[in-house]
From Swiss-Prot:
The keyword Ribonucleoprotein does not apply. Keywords: Electron transport, Heme, Iron, Metal-binding, Periplasm, Pyrrolidone carboxylic acid, Signal, Transport. This is Cytochrome c-554. It is found in: Periplasm. Residues 1-20 form the signal peptide. Gene3D superfamilies: Cytochrome c/b562. The keyword Electron transport applies.
Amino acid sequence: MRPIPALALTFSLVAMPALAQDARQIERMIEGRHGLMTLMAHELGKLGGMAKEETPYDAEVAGKAASNLSALASVISPELFPKGSAVGEAEDSEALPAIWEKPDDFAQKISGMEEAAAKMQAAAGTDLASLQGAMRDLGAACGSCHETYRQKD
């Protein structure tokens, strides 16, 4: 075997496990994002039902749901969106390439969502009107990020 092709073959065999590991790490990040969003949706469902007056307002339930939501929101960070995890690059991803094109704006939207979740935590157990106001702000914060950075279904 000639030296150059042998070297290329050796390099490719050595690099393949690293590439597979990177792909698995990206897959895990996407799974983690989906799990996190599912948990947030669960808590938002409780709060949204009360805000829309579809379920009776319960200060204790609202406070706990808002506390959980705020804790979950604090976990979201740009690090959960590594390069290579965009729609078309990774299976099951809904992350648009704009995340990596406008990283500062993306990080700012995450911070806005965290702030809105913290305000929800402070308001949810107070009364229905406070919950409803905080829900509008939280919905706007979530929507602004999803509108720009998430592929529509």
